[in-house]
């Protein structure tokens, strides 16, 4: 009976699995650029999209609407990585319906040069539009308009310079 109790309560170490997952996920993230490098790269992409929308379509009233933020990684929950959200750019007055298709084409063209795929429609109705483009390493570009337009880039999971070797 004592042997059965010892066997049933045995020496299982779920903590070992968690440590192994953390090591595995951190090793995968070591293959990626640092969070800071990816933030810098995607900030350039965001600014190129903004500048091209301004020069080609006259959409010029952009401003930074927040400071951005960071969170843990849903895809790598045991890792030391972070997902970052670049500061949101807002366009006062939005994109008129008659310019929406051209604006999406501009966003797709600029973003494609940085490894993003084509635009996936989230909402497309008069006065309200939104697309998302998926990039390398789980990055996302969100572009939408209602009364005002927004341009937001989300950096996929990366280790900070401190945690990257």
Range-by-range predicted roles:
Residues 6-10:
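C-terminal motif of bacterial Sec signal peptides marking the signal peptidase cleavage site
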Residues 12-57, 94-101, 112, 118-165:
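An acidic-aromatic pocket/loop used at catalytic or ligand-binding sites
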Residues 37, 41-87:
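Compositionally biased P/S/T/G-rich terminal and signal peptide-adjacent segments
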Residues 76-118:
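Mature extracytoplasmic domains of secretory-pathway proteins
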